[in-house]
Amino acid sequence: MASAVERTDDLVREYLIYRGFTSTLKHLDSEIKTDKEKGFRVDKIMDQLQLLIQSCDLTGLKEYWANLERRLFCRLEDVYKPTVSKLRTSLYRFYLIHTVQVKNVEKTQEFFQKQALELQAQAEWRDWFSLPFIPAPEQNPSFSAYFSRQWADTFLVSLHNFLSVLFQCMPLPALLSFDSEVQRITSLQEDNEQLRQTVFALQGESRLKKDEQMVHHKLPPYVQHMDRLGDTELDLVSSQRNVNMATPSRNFFSTFLPQGRRAPGRTAPGPQSSPTQSALGRKDAAASMQSSKAKDKEVKPPSVSSMTAELSTSHPRQRRHQDHEKERKELFSKHAAQGSEKKTDSDPDTQTEAPPDQTDSANQTRVCDVGGAGAEQPFIKLSQEEYGEHHSSIMHCRVDCSGRRVASLDVDGVVKVWAFNPIMQTKATIMSKSPLLSLEWAAKPDRLLLLGSGVGTVKLYDTDAKKCLYEMTIDDVHPRILSLACSPSGTSFVCSAAAHSGAVMESEPRGSAPVSGQLLLWDTKTVKQQLQFALEPGPVAINCTAFNHNGNLLVTGAADGIIRLFDMQRYESALSWKAHDGEVYSVEFSYDENTVFSIGEDGKFVQWNIHRCGVKQSEYSLSQDAVGPFVLSGYSGYKQVQVPRGRLFAFDSEGQHVLTCSSTGGNIYRLNKAEAGLESVLSLAGHKAPVVTVDWCSAMDCGTCLTASMDGKIKLSTLLAQKP
């Protein structure tokens, strides 16, 4: 209910601004600030009650409780009135115990003076009037239980639960019921998307299985036409069979590979067709296309009649029939391996006159080659699309939490919000007067986008309404907002602000000395700074930030090469260690969140154990194409250099594979032990300029990989995960 109230308040505020009712908006804001129900947020109400108790404000406590009874408890049925009375009694006793614990005798006596008329007739308060006169009430058997921490916690939890259930059961006005409809529609859309992805994955698996079965059960072309062969042609089959037996047998998966990727041990056929192929070509000439007829005329094999005459003089008719029967037995005894063995390679000219079954086999090879060698690869690349709305180098490219939209930022400060399902379509274009350096999707709600600028401000942009909701001034001394990270569990976000680096352009490499900076915590609801983190040994620019799944941990990589791990429950640094020689460019939690991965200026891709400070679990060396700075060269000595700003690597849904940048696309590696190194499993090529940032969004068995390059092009590759 609290979220629905907050959302409704925002919508009403937006409507009043749209209508120009500024005075009404001012009254609304002032009343929201003094709202005693705190937007029906139980945690805020509990905080207010405890604040009044800790300040020993008896009058304020009575007025606040009376307001709750007048606004909330009066709507309850009579059967719940004893519960409300018991909670009020426990609240007053909680107040009294606090005054005794802080040794504020005046407040203790004041309570009994003001409440004497109301409480002296109640039997449960009869013994409590002696409380101010007992020297050590915490040791008295009548009061010792109330001084225990267990009783206080039990009371607070009971009151919290009572208010929570009350808010859930309260009848809602019609205006507030929209939130349940929005949640229901959103849930249906998510279920729809998951089912669509499931159907898509099942269709891909079904197509692969069907194609595999076709390869298993496909017979060699000469066997399919065996019934139509005459005696003379059987002799040619036998002679061709003897030639084929001398060649090494093929592996079954070689049928999935294109001609260029097959094993070098195989000898390619000559430019001249075999007698069998030419004979079959003439037998099927009536059913083939005109192009096949033309090519058949170009190929001039040896005369069939002359070869038949030679074979007939050396082999009797009975021997030919025996060879024929032996041929059939050998065929059916070696079903799958024999079928792939008898399938012969041919040059482009002879492929045109092959029967239809050979064309099907060629199609099968093409489909499986989309993702590599079929079962040998963990992913199959189903498709690759290009988004080309940007006209300069990309800095950031991120998919939102729902996996439906993408936000991309280029060096000109242009932000594009676009969808790729079911079709690629631009939803919003954001152009800022000030240069933009960073972006991040908000976790709740996921329609909001945070944009960090180079003049010390962060904008909160609504991608649905296509307008800026707020512009927060972060720091004038540290105007460059290098990194943004939203907490998955709330409305707060972490902001990294840095001083000017001294470079002429943002895309130029930074100097050797670490740049000064701050790490701040802000709230998108209150639009206020909550905290400034302490950075040891001194203030330094934080290049990258990342939360774990529940927002309890925050990992950062800085310009001084140090990785810092923060406890977000205590808002303090838990660990820090020197990770790289030079700056830390990108950092992420692993799938199980027991380790942290980082890429630094030294070209190292390192896995760190967060339970053992500074201990490397694995280390890999990457090329400059994957680390940066990225260089784009052109004609007449043109050269563009860009330092890393976005994510340099991203994991799949199970954390077993990682996507990195390269000069022509993205590379997917399998994470092995340190001594085994990174194992390349798939290359997502297609770019003509260096890729500078990547992202990987997984849904069901299908994953979407984003690779963005310096020429403004973004490639969207759809992958199908193959289950082992």
UniProtKB/Swiss-Prot annotation:
Membrane topology, record value: Peripheral membrane protein
Ranges of Polar residues composition bias in the record: 270-279, 303-315, 349-365
Amino acid composition bias (Basic and acidic residues), ranges on this chain: 322-333
Positions carrying Phosphoserine: 274
Highest taxon, organism lineage: Eukaryota
GO-annotated cellular components: cytosol; early endosome membrane; endosome membrane; late endosome membrane
Protein's UniProt name: WD repeat-containing protein 91
Residues making up the signal peptide according to the UniProt record: none
Keyword annotations: Coiled coil, Endosome, Membrane, Phosphoprotein, Repeat, WD repeat
UniProt-listed Pfam families: CTLH_Armc9, WD40
InterPro entries recorded: ARMC9_CTLH-like_dom, WD40/YVTN_repeat-like_dom_sf, WD40_repeat_dom_sf, WD40_rpt, WDR91
Localization, UniProt: Early endosome membrane; Late endosome membrane
Summary of the function given for this chain in its UniProt record: Functions as a negative regulator of the PI3 kinase/PI3K activity associated with endosomal membranes. By modifying the phosphatidylinositol 3-phosphate/PtdInsP3 content of endosomal membranes may regulate endosome fusion, recycling, sorting and early to late endosome transport.
Coiled coil segments of this chain: 178-207
Lineage of producing organism: Eukaryota, Metazoa, Chordata, Craniata, Vertebrata
Gene name of the encoded protein: wdr91
Stretch list, region Disordered: 249-365
Species: Danio rerio
Family: Belongs to the WD repeat WDR91 family.
UniProt record, GO biological process: early endosome to late endosome transport; negative regulation of phosphatidylinositol 3-kinase/protein kinase B signal transduction
GO MF terms held by the record: phosphatidylinositol 3-kinase inhibitor activity; phosphatidylinositol 3-kinase regulator activity
